[in-house]
Amino acid sequence: MSAESFNIVHIRENKLLARRELLVEAVHQNASTPTRQSVREWVAKQLGIDISNVFVRRIKTEFGRGRSLAEVHVYNDSKIARVIEPLYILARNLGEEGKKLLEEAKKRRNERREKKKRKKK
């Protein structure tokens, strides 16, 4: 059992983007900053939703206090999240699947650059 305790500090409903924006406090005395995965799992469990709809934007730790604040976006549908969230956030939250998405995006970008170079010549 970890020495972390979580608490939802604030919830904001963003109907335009079909998501909820949460501010989650993590108290972790004498322990390291909680991982994105542990925050995602806790939020998904608390809200009773699938973990694929939860994305941690950032975790900010207060030096020497054993307390962190995490900004979390919870989407109604994971397909909407993949369109709205930046690729680097997807890569950080989805692990291997996110890294594959990032690599595919880099390949597409490089292909576009090559195409532009060929047109200029």
From Swiss-Prot:
Pfam families: Ribosomal_S24e (PF01282). GO terms for cellular component: ribonucleoprotein complex; ribosome. Keywords: Ribonucleoprotein, Ribosomal protein. The keyword Ribosomal protein applies. InterPro entries: eRP_eS24_sf (IPR053709), Ribosomal_eS24 (IPR001976), Ribosomal_eS24_CS (IPR018098), Ribosomal_uL23/eL15/eS24_sf (IPR012678). One of its GO terms (molecular function) is structural constituent of ribosome. One of its GO terms (biological process) is translation. Belongs to the eukaryotic ribosomal protein eS24 family. HAMAP family: Ribosomal_eS24 (MF_00545). This is Small ribosomal subunit protein eS24. It comes from Pyrobaculum aerophilum (strain ATCC 51768 / DSM 7523 / JCM 9630 / CIP 104966 / NBRC 100827 / IM2).
